[in-house]
Amino acid sequence: MNIGLIAHDAKKILMQNFTIAYRGILSKHEIYATGTTGRLIEEVTNLTVHKYLAGHLGGEQQLASQIEHNQIDMVIFLRDPQSPKSHEPDVMNVIHLCDTYNIPFATNLATAELLVKALEHGDLEWREMIKK
């Protein structure tokens, strides 16, 4: 499965810790991330990450394009609710597209862990049927 990972600046360390904790599960899938987040994940996990541009340079738009083409199966976007809203339209577009195309989406650690555990148990295999 193709997993999109994004983290606001204040959540990047949390994303690193999350990917360290679930490295074994994530290593069985393709990981896509915005530029800085992807680089930070690679540094601590040695996972291969397909990196988009940095989020503020269009990385979230690149992810959105893959969602529109049904090429992403799950998105974890660790958002900082206190973050400036400078690229909020891009964030809202990703949320809208995930809702439109029935792509599981998490914005916090609790939901992210539920999605990764579901992934581990095969509960998201229905995504493969949709892609055909």
Place the predicted regions along the sequence by residue:
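Short, acidic/small-residue loops that bind anionic groups at enzyme active sites
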Residues: 95-115
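Mid-chain, well-packed structural core segment of small domains
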Residues: 60-100
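Short internal beta-strands
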Residues: 28-37
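Short hydrophobic/aromatic-enriched beta-strand-loop microsegments
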Residues: 30, 47-58, 126-129
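Histidine-anchored nucleotide/phosphate-binding helix
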Residues: 15-24
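Short, glycine-/small-residue-rich phosphate/pyrophosphate-handling segment
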Residues: 110-132
